From Swiss-Prot:
InterPro entries: DNA_gyrase_inhibitor_YacG, Znf_NHR/GATA
Gene this protein is translated from: yacG
Protein name (database record): DNA gyrase inhibitor YacG
Source species taxonomy: Bacteria, Pseudomonadati, Pseudomonadota, Alphaproteobacteria, Hyphomicrobiales
Keywords annotated in UniProt: Metal-binding, Zinc
Cofactor annotation comment: Binds 1 zinc ion.
Length: 68
């Protein structure tokens, strides 16, 4: 690929505030936005929805037991 056809690097927007991201905190624009995202993960704000399965009786399956 020649230099004439190469596109200059354009940073993607920060997923928290929308400002351009910077290399140091990629994909975020700042330490603050990176910390906001980490806090959302740690407090459960980001979650994957789960469909509860039922057994043959129509009763919900019991949650798996945690090893102690």
């Amino acid at each position: 690929m020649s230099d004439e056809t190469a596109k200059p690097f354009e940073p993607k927007p920060c997923p928290i505030c929308g400002k351009p991201s910077i290399e140091r905190y990629k994909p975020f624009c700042s330490k603050r936005c990176a910390d906001v995202d980490l806090n959302r993960w740690l407090t459960g704000a980001y979650a994957i929805p789960v469909v509860e399965e039922e057994d043959e009786d129509g009763e919900p399956l019991s949650p798996p037991l945690r090893p102690e």
